From Swiss-Prot:
It holds the Pfam family TSP1_ADAMTS. SUPFAM superfamilies: Metalloproteases ('zincins'), catalytic domain (SSF55486), TSP-1 type 1 repeat (SSF82895). Residues 40-50 have a biased composition (Pro residues). It is found in: Secreted, Extracellular space, Extracellular matrix. This is A disintegrin and metalloproteinase with thrombospondin motifs 16. Zn(2+) binds at C249, H433, H437, H443. The spacer domain and the TSP type-1 domains are important for a tight interaction with the extracellular matrix. A motif (Cysteine switch) lies at residues 247-254. Residues 290-495 form the Peptidase M12B domain. Gene3D superfamilies: 2.60.120.830, 3.40.1620.60, Collagenase (Catalytic Domain), Thrombospondin type-1 (TSP1) repeat.
Amino acid sequence: MKPRARGWRGLAALWMLLAQVAEQAPACAMGPAAAAPGSPSVPRPPPPAERPGWMEKGEYDLVSAYEVDHRGDYVSHEIMHHQRRRRAVPVSEVESLHLRLKGSRHDFHMDLRTSSSLVAPGFIVQTLGKTGTKSVQTLPPEDFCFYQGSLRSHRNSSVALSTCQGLSGMIRTEEADYFLRPLPSHLSWKLGRAAQGSSPSHVLYKRSTEPHAPGASEVLVTSRTWELAHQPLHSSDLRLGLPQKQHFCGRRKKYMPQPPKEDLFILPDEYKSCLRHKRSLLRSHRNEELNVETLVVVDKKMMQNHGHENITTYVLTILNMVSALFKDGTIGGNINIAIVGLILLEDEQPGLVISHHADHTLSSFCQWQSGLMGKDGTRHDHAILLTGLDICSWKNEPCDTLGFAPISGMCSKYRSCTINEDTGLGLAFTIAHESGHNFGMIHDGEGNMCKKSEGNIMSPTLAGRNGVFSWSPCSRQYLHKFLSTAQAICLADQPKPVKEYKYPEKLPGELYDANTQCKWQFGEKAKLCMLDFKKDICKALWCHRIGRKCETKFMPAAEGTICGHDMWCRGGQCVKYGDEGPKPTHGHWSDWSSWSPCSRTCGGGVSHRSRLCTNPKPSHGGKFCEGSTRTLKLCNSQKCPRDSVDFRAAQCAEHNSRRFRGRHYKWKPYTQVEDQDLCKLYCIAEGFDFFFSLSNKVKDGTPCSEDSRNVCIDGICERVGCDNVLGSDAVEDVCGVCNGNNSACTIHRGLYTKHHHTNQYYHMVTIPSGARSIRIYEMNVSTSYISVRNALRRYYLNGHWTVDWPGRYKFSGTTFDYRRSYNEPENLIATGPTNETLIVELLFQGRNPGVAWEYSMPRLGTEKQPPAQPSYTWAIVRSECSVSCGGGQMTVREGCYRDLKFQVNMSFCNPKTRPVTGLVPCKVSACPPSWSVGNWSACSRTCGGGAQSRPVQCTRRVHYDSEPVPASLCPQPAPSSRQACNSQSCPPAWSAGPWAECSHTCGKGWRKRAVACKSTNPSARAQLLPDAVCTSEPKPRMHEACLLQRCHKPKKLQWLVSAWSQCSVTCERGTQKRFLKCAEKYVSGKYRELASKKCSHLPKPSLELERACAPLPCPRHPPFAAAGPSRGSWFASPWSQCTASCGGGVQTRSVQCLAGGRPASGCLLHQKPSASLACNTHFCPIAEKKDAFCKDYFHWCYLVPQHGMCSHKFYGKQCCKTCSKSNL
């Protein structure tokens, strides 16, 4: 049959982490330290001088922190991680630590102890990839550095500190709450540390001065991008004034099944072997803590949302909240969530299918986790799957389901599992709700008397009453019912105490503001609703996304969330900041009710009385009452008349009138069942060969079996002693005397070893009437059979050559247990007493290995002595005095004793005569004077002989305190106050001399020094030793690079040649000149002309500086010019090509005076166009010797000259070819 399941949808919450004071975060802070991928950018806090708060208000105290002993005497200023100093201390040991903070306004003496119980011994974090395990991480004992405790000087105070690097944490008193942090070095100047005489190492400031609203001193950390911001809203999304309810198991009732109406099929290996325990877990472990050894699995989607570096801290934070919910006083039990392992899934795993379909995913996960087992064969009690998908209970797509779990599956190998959707810190409520289903809890208002709208953890919809979640009375009853079954025995395992993986000491709402909580519930664009209507976010967080509408999921803002100016949420109420809200009210028991009527009129029934935790009820996180809610006792123990109907048979007969599978049957008891089923009503139909369990439990007071005093109560077989006291360990001795010593009877023994003919009965022993403790057994396996008859030859066992089956046979006033196996000797056992004489015979079938027998008979005069009536008396038990003198205390407690010998339940004694108990003073006389010595100071030297001292004073303890007295009153001589220490020789060490001067005055150079191995004993002169002697440390460097200053780069000077000048004549033959000039080349590639003497140190290139030129032949006058009225005009031909590409060239053209296309005269000379023109006058580069290996090594070298980087050492060399061309 498929297990029934339950689901829950709860709050999504992402919160705000306050920036640490002056950008200084504690080294061991467990909160996230950086934004996850995809999160908004992280703004840097402003410099310290710009921050408001305690730094500017002066509401701080600079304190010195140091370790002291339990008397408050100084030990050391070195406060390091305590476990790292004492690695031999096991994790399970609760280690004490005493610290003192001393400042100008505060002097705190703290008594601390290590935390425990969240993670189990051997806790590991295992990462699984495609090919299996990728990594396994542990939490080493030395990494646990968290302490809790109180202040000696303040009542009702509490301290929670981390000692990982310095001291960080919170100190709470009735007057104020304080934060303690290491003093950042870069704030020392601002706080005036240098001006003070002492050396404070920490800063202590009130929590009321801590910044609250998001601002310059906060860092927004987004560890998950919520996909719902981009999804369409459900039809029930809340509009302004129309609240949207969150359904834990979805809105469709057909997918919210009821508990199984029939017994589930139980696989042989479904429960641990301890399931066969007969006793109730609640009674066998009444005042003990029940531990749920929990395995947590995180899927791939959730890993992607949070990141591998943050997921472990996030999950442990969630489970820490779950642990607190199960320790809430309203649950009515003492349940501890102990995490045994964390599995991180980076890739899909074979056999595990995770999808939006919650039902299918749960089925796959339950099967997958059932195969997980430790290397030593150990298994977890409970498995939790955390998924980043939006799951749905009835389809493979997102909907309003948050969780799914089988009902009453706890401790089952295949059904103790849940699936939970990640919704931020509200995930803790989902896990608690689904685990509640695993404990057998049903939704409030569904088949029970509790109301749906009370705002409890098991409500069908997620809506806290006044922002407070608790367990309803129905949930408490379901849990009590489950813990009363044998199935819950797996929770009796007691993990060894471990040190707790500590979390940030601040409240969640202080770490994450309301805007961030809205983002996790409604997406990236959501923020706290600020529209014009008043809503109390401490009862329901209202958020705004778009338009003029606000929405809520009826989850209150997290504890510590700012709800107004100088106000915060505490316990569902908006109270003044620093107030704790409503104080917790611890529950107390009401008076016992009267005893109920006896469940039977004879034969031993059960009566009970109860009390309620209602005087008052626990509220606001108060503890539930300790102890049992019900007390049981046996009643009407006299035997029933002989003609009365057997009590179990009467219960079977009640079903005769009820139809079973379509017809009526006559039922009678069937008792051949396993021990764990003795208290179920198994009946067999008369005339048929089938039997059936007609009820899961018989009526209270029904004997577990015919031959046992034990009775069934609530379906559990409870032990009854021979003194007819429920739960008593009293047993009869072999004489049948309750708690006897075997002295009231005579034990008869014998051994029958004769051999006879086969297939005949032979007499072995005659057992008289009244015999007890009868035992007849073969010495070895044989083919013969033990037979029993009475004196009238009536056979009860194996008579008339007929062999009976092994089993229980009732005859002669007692029950005989007959056992026979093919590989075990035959034996017959009975408790007695018998009411007739029995004759034991042997049906001989072959060789006789020997048959032993024994029984007891009462001594004369002891048979009919009636048992004495027990007496019940109060007794006082005093503890040892806490001190031997000087005033101490001792504890006085009461106990109820039977016959002043055996302690029993206190309900048997008269409550009116109950003695007064508590703490009483003792040993008030003054102690004799004695020497009081303090701890030795640190040695003045670490080696070579030093000294240390300690305070020594003569004191006397009087009235719980010590007072100094004259030293003459103490025994002499006085203890030594000074002693030698560290007398061992100092090891040799390296001695390094001063560094020599740098080899270069500019640029990179080298310097050296002398290094030698020398002795370090302070009592002798240092001696040079061979280098091989100094082996404890590496030899210091003898050479190192040095740079005094950078060298100035030389100017890049070079000779440049000018362009050729114009020809000295305009026609015929002339000359041209050019000049060498000194120039400096800029990075951009341009040149600046300098005086020639600047380049005097450079060789001048050998170039031609003068050359001949002939622009055009000079024109000749025509021999004849015709006279006429027309005058010629100047005509010019196109310019010729430039005579040089650089350095100055000449272009020429022909200029003629023409008229009508013929040469003419009369052209005006001053109008004649120019016949030559200078061209390409820019400098020519000096021809340099080309590097045979000059080439480009990258395809982007063309960009180097464009950006003026050819002068760069790297780029100029790698792009040599391109840079050389750019200079042309």
